[in-house]
Curated annotation (Swiss-Prot):
Pfam families: TMEM71 (PF15121). This is Transmembrane protein 71. It comes from Mus musculus. Residues 1-25 are annotated as: Disordered. The lineage of its organism: Eukaryota, Metazoa, Chordata, Craniata, Vertebrata. InterPro entries: TMEM71 (IPR027975). Coiled coil: none annotated.
Length: 287
């Protein structure tokens, strides 16, 4: 198998007649170069054995441009034969051309990464869930960013429209006054926004204080009711022990009940004092 042989090619006339003998015989170079390796090179050329009947000159064969670069000639011993006079005749039925095609994939699909079950169950993949930091790197939602950008753009458009209207009403000579007024208007808008934010903060703090007072009052009522019930139970037990049981056992029960009553009364007065102190501070802050 040989690559790109010059056979089966297009003949080109050669003007040189130096190789032609005086009796019209073929030159030695006309013989088929089957025993040389020069003709295997695709860029080399050799003289064919055919003669132009008009000029009597030999043809120089070159590689045909119609032959693809990936073509191969398959020669056998029966592909050509040479007569005693040196004429070479090709047998096309015994000479074949084989082309080796280069398959190129034009459309290449991107490989999708298929995660295996082991990678999904890897504890390192769920590290963010375990530490609770899956939303730690998220600063704000995209909707909030878009909302803030829209407010900024509206504020800038409002400032520009106000300044343009003010400058259109002023004459040309009062350019400095118009620029100063255009600078004052955004300041007034900023001051109004700051005052509104302060009012919102005051309202929120007042609402929080009211809620704290309500919760403290409910907790105090729960504690006071429990301590009052405990005090009443202690008094009833002391009276019954004094009435039905006498002697040293009654004195021991009475001493234990007095200690319990003292502890309950002390905690009750402390809770009442804290409650009245908190209410007075809240009223003073509200005024």
């Amino acid at each position: 198998m040989y690559r790109d042989s010059p056979l089966m090619s297009t003949p080109v006339a050669n003007d040189s007649r130096s190789d032609e003998g005086p009796s019209g015989k073929l030159s030695p170079t006309c013989l088929f170069p089957s025993f040389t390796c020069d003709f295997l090179d695709g860029d080399s050329s050799f003289e064919c054995c055919s003669i132009d009947p008009l000029t009597g000159s030999h043809y120089i064969c070159r590689r045909s441009p119609r032959l693809l670069t990936n073509g191969y000639y398959i020669w056998t011993e029966d592909s050509f034969f040479c007569d005693p006079d040196g004429h070479i005749t090709l047998n096309p039925s015994q000479t074949s051309v084989m082309y080796k095609e280069n398959l190129v994939r034009i459309f290449r699909k991107k490989k999708r990464t298929h995660r295996s079950l082991s990678s999904l169950l890897d504890p390192r993949a769920s590290k963010s869930w375990l530490h609770g930091s899956i939303f730690g790197e998220v600063d704000s939602l995209p909707s909030e960013d878009l909302w803030l950008d829209g407010i900024r753009s509206l504020g800038s458009d409002l400032d520009c429209s106000l300044s343009d209207g003010w400058e259109s009403q002023k004459p040309v000579t009062d350019t400095s006054e118009s620029s100063s007024s255009g600078y004052i208007l955004p300041q007034s808008l900023r001051e109004s926004s700051q005052s509104s934010s302060l009012q919102l903060q005051v309202k929120a703090s007042g609402h929080f204080e009211k809620n704290s007072l309500v919760h403290s009052r409910a907790g105090l009522m729960h504690k006071v009711s429990f301590q009052a019930i405990l005090l009443a139970v202690c008094l009833v037990i002391s009276a019954y022990t004094r009435w039905f049981v006498g002697g040293e056992l009654a004195s021991i029960f009475t001493c234990a009940l007095l200690i319990t009553i003292a502890y309950v009364v002390k905690s009750l007065f402390l809770n009442l004092a804290r409650y009245f102190k908190a209410t007075s501070c809240a009223r003073f802050d509200s005024t």
